[in-house]
Amino acid sequence: MAAPVLFHHPSSLEHDPGPHPEQPARIVAIERALEERGWLGFERRLSPPATRVQLEAVHPARLINGVQELCASGGGAIDGDTVVSPGSWEAALHGAGGAVAVVDTLVGMPGAVDPARLAVSVHRPPGHHAEARRSMGFCLFNNVAVAARHARDAHGVRRVLILDWDVHHGNGTQDVFWEDAGVLFCSIHQWPLYPGTGAAGETGAGAGAGYTVNLPVPPGSGDDVFGSLVEHVVVPAARAYDPELILVSAGFDAHLDDPLADGRVTDAGFATMAASVRAVADALRVPVGVVLEGGYDLGALSRGLVASLEVLAAEGPVAAPELDVHPLSERYRAQHAALLG
């Protein structure tokens, strides 16, 4: 099996929102932690910038042009949480481009003798709050949505599973694929919390009805809750949906050390969720792409990502974790019975 691939780019350090939790030091901390571990065997590549065609498959030209013009004018605030600097344009282009490169690496080489089964994009700013027509929540473009749409448009992938375990609901990703059965979007997030979306009853509409799976959890939820929801709700949903590609919107702000929420997930908890993902991906014989989202305690962020990637990149089979079924898992399994079969 080919070595896993990690996409990054120095432009991530040039996005400068000023005094802000989403800071360049996030990337510095991650790369230092990975370097200390020999990059976990990942082959490192520089991310290309996303093209206009790739961005416009998700976002209208008006939004893209607005971000570009604000950056070119010296920067400023899009909203109270979302601030750009002159360097933010290149950072955003390469962030979306890194996610696209993940897809190209995993599914873009038909007939390859030894394709990669794991690729990760380590970029900032994050993307999962960016809706089709609105940048928000620290996010300019929705990187994982651009990647999923690229997988389908450029490579003919019919079904993509996106698992978002950031502590904040991925409202932007939900918005993009709300009426689309070609993407199964599963989000585990604290409720109530910013951005205020992601109620359990939000399940998609039209052709996408039933293909949005929101799994809100109360403040104080830890390894048992998050792990059970992945293993006992997301994994059965994946088996029923039978995706050709799994993408993880990997935020690490559900960690017990993170200052922006009230999660209690530990490093081991992220590793457990990753083990569930790896086990079902192996069973379905599909590749896994990881796209960085949030995480604002530098130590928790870097440790959580390293713990997840160690499991996902492990040689040999990874056993599914043996976890008790949490009451929330039972409730959500009943709610999504039509999807789970």
Predicted regions, residues:
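N-terminal low-complexity, Ser/Thr- and acidic-residue-enriched intrinsically disordered segments
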Residues: 1-57
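A general "terminal functional-core" signal
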Residues: 2-7, 15, 66-341
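Residue-level marker of positions within ordered structural domains that often coincide
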Residues: 11, 35, 60, 104, ...
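Short glycine-centered helix-capping/turn motifs at secondary-structure transition points
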Residues: 34-38, 62, 155, 263
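Charged, often glycine-rich, active-site loop that binds/positions anionic groups
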Residues: 48-72
